[in-house]
Amino acid sequence: MNAVDTNILFYAQDPRDPLKQSTASSLIWSLPNGILFWQVICEFIASARKLEPFGYDCEKAFHDVRELGRSWDTVFPDWATLDGAMELTSRQSISFWDASIISECLLNGVVRLYSEDLDTHDGIDGLEIINPFRNP
């Protein structure tokens, strides 16, 4: 299973960096077995306001994640997610929000998480975290 962080969804719609936009969009639509996390959906819709000057708004963001949700599973947080996030926050020294996404990945069999912000060469607890914008 594969998942993307909020920034990947955001860059797919952000025309200010055409290379990142192309990379993110291609990645999203080429990933097999994708999972959308509720937190990522909410953050993406909220962040779409930053793209209003470019003709992209919350309504379009909502439409796009609904469309993506037709081919990807959607996962909602539960207490196990929060428990895992609290443990990861103290053990890995990462923010609670990042830990929540990682916890969701670990609980739902995600093997690869694509994120610009969480990039780590070592991964976390077997989860591979990949920055798709980094040159190999």
Task: List PLM regions with ranges.
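Acidic, PIN/NYN-like endoribonuclease modules and their adjacent C-terminal/linker elements
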Residues: M1, I102-P136
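Short, well-structured N-terminal submotif of metal-dependent ribonuclease cores
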Residues: M1-L36, L51-H63, P136
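Aromatic- and histidine-enriched alpha-helix N-cap/loop-to-helix transition segments
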Residues: L36-Q39, F96
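Active-site neighborhoods of divalent-metal-dependent phosphate/nucleic-acid chemistry enzymes
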Residues: W72-Y114
